[in-house]
Amino acid sequence: MKALVLGGIGCVTVVDACVCSAADLGENYAVNASHVASGLPRCAAIIESLLGLNDNVSGSYVEDTLANILEKRAEFFEQFTLVVATQLREKEAMALDKVCRGFGVKALFVRSHGMVGVLRASVREHCIIESKPDHLPHDLRLSNPWPELSAFAESFRIGDGAKEYDLYEHMDDMTFKHVPYVVLLLHMLEQWKRTHDGEAPCTSADLRELKANIRAMLRKGDEENIREAVAAAHRLISPKPSSSSSSSPSSAATVPSEVAAVLNDPAARLGDTGTAVTNFWIIVSALREFVYGDGADDNGTSPGGGCMDTDSESESRISASSAGMGTRELPIDGSLPDMTSTTESYLALQEVYTAKAASDADAVYNIVRRKLAEMGRDDASISPVEVKHMCKHARCLQVVRHASLEEEMQPTDLKRGKIEQLLEDETTTSCTLFYLLLRAVDRAYESLNRYPGEFNEELENDISTLRSSAVSILGEYGLSQNLNLPLGLLDDYAKEVCRYGSAELHVVSAILGGIAAQESLKLILGQYIPIAGTYVFDAVHMLGATIAL
């Protein structure tokens, strides 16, 4: 919570029924000796310390147990954007998860147990506008330029257009070196179509020929814009329409597969899911119509399609045919990469892309307004700014839905295979064993009414109890206790976990707290993709792994 408050989270509420004790002094930085001496509720001490870190953050505390709140006033959790629960056992976590899902509230479960840390996000539906992929190429639309972009490229032409490279024939060397590579490629596309019966390049062989033609334009060998054009030549490649297609557009559009999955999600067909329609899905529905048109079938496409045979430089995408009035393209974001050019030419080109982005966003907003009217909602309930933001990041849209904790605990053949694979992989063996043993710890707690290993005189019995609980869990998945693990490995890990007792080590908690803060921001802001599954941190071997069941 310290990292969240320092980051300006806005408002926090701490729920805890305990009173500050001497044990907290070694485990919780927010508790000091004066808090212990005065018998202050631990939640009050934590809030006092947290709010002192950032004056812009407000906070409150509730002195109560989770069990009491769940039993008497579960609606308490409905007010929150995110519930972060720490140190809960399996049954407690499942009960809280069920309540949060019922209210559509995101939950994050964090647990530190000795040298092991566990983190699990649980969301019924998490809509991500800015997934921020590691590599997102600029959307320049060179294979299918719009009229204003073509006109911009045409403005560089010198001569009567009779010769193949007449654009550059009368340019001096300095002017030639500063022609933006976008213009070079657009003219190269025009020349290609002129000599290939109007067909656009669509194969790897075409790409190699294009690059050779571009390199042939070098004069002194130091033209950086030519090198940039060669590096971006793959952007001219277009999917080749199939022969069975009922229509043959000059350039089929492409939509990233992750985004296509969002556009084709049942929730994008407003009202089909039976749940309250959020602004996100209304705008996605408008984007779907913008791309595919209002005549798209259940898959978001009309008959026809194509494939693209290109080298690895090309972005992995799926083809989408036109339907109705669909543009077959996502709204352009309007951004430009750096390139060799004069300042005047670059700014003029930027204006062309900015104007196109604004035009696309306006078109989507008009669809949104129409849909709002059809739903009987005020068209001011979704602002043009919100639509523009989603259009700008249209290529980064994703939707995440996690299995509930209850579903995760239910054995299936698929989960059995995943556990076997994780245990056999040397990089994930230890984390998987710790994951299973922490579940076994909670089962052992039910019979012992304490954590295994809390009392030295009961250590051997606790090890046996914990091992039996772990074997029972493996048996539920139809797995032999030995599997393909080295002899005695499960016993060794059971002894290690029992050795922890109920210890909560500060160093492990600190690392896990940092990860939890990062995941919390992902869930609150709708940026980046949260961890899908249970993340296990093994501080013994300094390893981490995600167990997705």
Predicted regions and their residues:
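Adenine nucleotide-associated cytosolic modules
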Residues: 1-549
